[in-house]
């Protein structure tokens, strides 16, 4: 872990005016797992509230466990942490804590993943999960104008039958959450769980009119990115950094402007890259890909949106123009209606003109 921190901190510091520009930059977040925003302090508080015993004696001890070597070592802790989420209020509190941090980072719109199977497997009703998350998002929209949507994600280490069962359990809630629930995603352990494993359930979701996204090309090969596009018919690729290994795929991603929701600090923490200065984000951007910056599981990976932008700006020496391009790509890649999307793009233009 020390090496990772050093790989960011040894880079020459950013100019104060660029830091200020990044912090105020309007942003959209498109790759965020709500369960991955569970900070140790809240995790401990919820454990106490619900009488859940944790294998860690303190918040500090839990933070020390966040030294991951790969995706699986992170997932083991992630699923253990989710056990403290039991009531609608728990899901509300977690979601509201994320909103507070996001608004502080000038996130104007977020499309948020949630994993119902993580909770229904533990006996938590799917209605509880939807209700808690939605209550926080609706409250934030009404009080602060915080724009958001939710994407229900299937866990790829489980079976397609399980995904179908989850879909059928959730569909009766669709009308109630029509203002928020816009899409279907696919996440969890990529190795050994190719996209085609979920071809039928994604076809069904497509028939139902959901937007489709999938994690691909994080630890999995470029072929998984191609299969997510051609077999699952997704509109966005979550991660996708390994696409660079396939020049033909790179050309396609650039020509079709298929968005990649890249998560730099996540890639560093999970050892997808061993040094942020080696991250391929800038190369992907310069190759004409619709690259975006996101925080993934910020409580576990040490940074929300501003931290991710600051890390790549410093390590990759990105210019204001490149940073604005990343922000613009994200607004354009949202699943918002055209008018709402245009409004956010105008806000971005206005910010850039004023700064």
Where do the language-model regions lie?
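Metal-cofactor-binding active-site regions of metalloenzymes
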Residues: 2-210, 219-224, 231-236, 242-355
